[in-house]
């Protein structure tokens, strides 16, 4: 692209300068001629026939914008005052138009997301359990010209139904003669009996139920031969699950011989891929390490989780020490307060001598010194 000519660039600069000068002139004219500039803008209303500036005392009338409804008893006129400002007004006199109220469909519910149904708001539909939404589940209130309306029709709630579940090779399911299953109706799969030493195992969920419209709870299982090899642990022995053939979900537990310890899990389960889960453990010679590396914990059917029901013994030691210190300090404060209370209780209040009333005839009586007082017993 060729660079712009110097003449074009200079012309554009002149137009910018001219626009700025005109804008400044408008403001200067308004200030010098005791006039107001453009009236304040509002979100819900706009001025009727606006002008560049208004003289003092001149009024501008507002009207509601498209999509807003005029409310009575609200001021819609602003006046240019002597200080070049406008009498403050608000656009509370114009409110958003509302779409019609939508009733929930039979067996359904309706929820207005913002609690209102003005244009821009959304309404959401849902159905009770056992039914599904047929149609648009969410509608929005839209502005169309000067009016508002929903962008679609209210959906319906239809009954959840399922077609028959998938058939499986070398297996079957119950209620195979039923063509339509209702919500939460279930079937149970099983494998056919076969000739030979190896039986068929049902791999997957045995029970399936109609969980949604044309949707079963899970994929159909399969019937196949699952056979894991004989589990052998050197320097160890089996203590449960003894046998010569190990089919799907067979569980075996091992024990190391004296002087050996486990490296791995002591319990394994025959998985659907003909391997043991987790892998076969080892029995290593020597004392068990104080802090051995923890093997990963697997949760397979029939395999217990060693953490279930066990309190976490790895409690932080510093937290325990802190709790003990807090308890000791609290006990010391209690004892100190008790001692001070008993000390104050033991102290008796100072005895106050009773006031002696002096009569008028005693005021002029002579004062006897201790040496002149006679013992009445010596008389």
Swiss-Prot record:
It comes from the Eukaryota. Keywords: Disulfide bond, Fertilization, Glycoprotein, Membrane, Repeat, Signal, Sushi, Transmembrane, Transmembrane helix. GO terms for cellular component: cell surface; membrane. This is Membrane cofactor protein. It holds the Pfam family Sushi. Residues 338-379 are cytoplasmic. Glycans are attached at residues 83, 114, 263, 290, 293. Interacts with C3b. Interacts with C4b. Interacts with moesin/MSN. It comes from Cavia porcellus (Guinea pig). Its main location: membrane. The chain crosses the membrane at residues 317-337. It is a single-pass type I membrane protein.
């Amino acid at each position: 692209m060729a660079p712009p000519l110097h003449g074009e660039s200079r012309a554009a600069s002149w137009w910018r300068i001219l626009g700025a000068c005109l804008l400044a002139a408008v403001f200067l004219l308004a200030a010098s001629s005791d006039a107001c500039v453009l009236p304040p803008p509002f979100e819900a209303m706009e001025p009727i026939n606006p002008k560049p500036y208004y003289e003092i005392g001149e009024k501008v009338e507002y009207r509601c914008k498209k999509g807003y409804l005029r409310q009575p008893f609200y001021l819609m006129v602003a006046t240019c005052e002597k200080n070049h400002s406008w009498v403050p007004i608000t656009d509370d006199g114009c409110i958003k138009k509302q779409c019609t109220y939508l009733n929930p469909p039979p067996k359904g519910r309706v929820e207005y997301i913002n609690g209102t149904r003005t244009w821009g708001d959304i309404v959401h539909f849902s159905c009770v359990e056992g039914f599904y939404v047929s149609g648009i589940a969410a509608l929005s209130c839209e502005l169309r010209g000067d009016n508002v309306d929903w962008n679609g029709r209210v959906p319906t709630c239809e009954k959840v139904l399922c077609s028959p579940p998938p058939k499986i090779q070398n297996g079957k399911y119950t209620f195979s003669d039923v063509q339509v299953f209702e919500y939460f109706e279930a079937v149970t799969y099983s494998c056919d009996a076969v000739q030979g030493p190896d039986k068929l195992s049902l791999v997957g969920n045995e029970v399936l139920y109609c969980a949604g419209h044309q949707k079963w709870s899970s994929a159909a299982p399969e019937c196949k031969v699952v056979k894991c090899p004989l589990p052998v642990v050197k320097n160890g022995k089996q203590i449960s699950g003894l046998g010569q053939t190990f089919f799907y979900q067979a569980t075996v537990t091992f024990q190391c011989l004296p002087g050996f310890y486990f490296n791995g899990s002591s319990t394994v389960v025959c998985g659907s891929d003909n391997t043991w889960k987790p892998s076969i453990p080892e029995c290593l010679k020597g004392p068990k390490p104080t802090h051995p590396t923890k093997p990963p914990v697997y949760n397979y059917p029939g395999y217990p989780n060693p953490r279930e029901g066990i309190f976490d013994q790895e409690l932080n030691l510093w937290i325990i020490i802190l709790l003990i210190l807090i308890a000791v300090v609290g006990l010391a404060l209690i004892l100190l307060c008790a001692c001070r209370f008993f000390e104050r209780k033991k102290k008796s209040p100072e005895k106050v001598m009773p006031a002696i009333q002096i009569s008028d005839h005693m005021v002029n009586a002579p004062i006897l010194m201790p040496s002149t007082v006679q013992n009445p017993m010596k008389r």
